[in-house]
């Protein structure tokens, strides 16, 4: 924004199973940028956050999550609402998340909250394990070293 005054851009962050555990740090980074570059006296919005959710492939969508993981999404939505801009006051207008941005993550929370685990879910969980195992094999990577926070569900699903 300093080098190209007046630039406006949108971050499109497709929410998926693997983004769940790191979304608060991501939101903090976005908030820092918003606080630095958004100004109350400027009608332009240098940066917007769009949060669609991944639907396909099914084995990477949030619908494979364990019920206790829903709390992560709840905490992320809460973080966004706690850091909303307040448009009716000079010092806080255009600074922070916009309500429509937080509403997008809230929608994801509500969809996930109403999700029912079925045999299709179980199959997608098994496919997730197959996917990361095959990815590690082909690319020489280590899923559990990269995402140690998923170790418990990985082993649970691997042994289904």
Q: Language-model segments: what does each one mean?
A:
Residues 160:
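Sequence context surrounding c-type heme c attachment/ligation sites in exported
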Residues 1-155:
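Conserved C-terminal portion of the radical SAM core fold
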């Amino acid at each position: 924004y300093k080098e190209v005054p007046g630039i406006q851009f949108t971050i499109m962050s497709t929410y998926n199973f693997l983004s769940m555990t790191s979304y608060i740090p991501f939101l903090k980074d976005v908030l820092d940028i918003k606080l630095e570059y958004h100004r109350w006296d400027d009608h332009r919005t240098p940066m917007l956050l769009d949060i669609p959710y991944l639907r396909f492939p099914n084995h990477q969508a949030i619908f494979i999550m364990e019920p206790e993981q829903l709390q992560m999404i709840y905490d992320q939505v809460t973080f966004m609402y706690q850091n909303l801009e307040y448009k009716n006051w000079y010092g806080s207008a255009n600074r922070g998340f916009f309500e429509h941005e937080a509403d997008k993550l809230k929608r994801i929370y509500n969809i996930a909250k109403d999700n029912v685990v079925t045999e299709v879910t179980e199959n997608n969980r098994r496919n997730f394990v197959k996917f990361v195992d095959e990815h590690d094999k082909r690319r020489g990577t280590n899923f559990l070293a990269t995402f140690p926070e998923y170790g418990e569900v990985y082993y649970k699903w691997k042994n289904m």
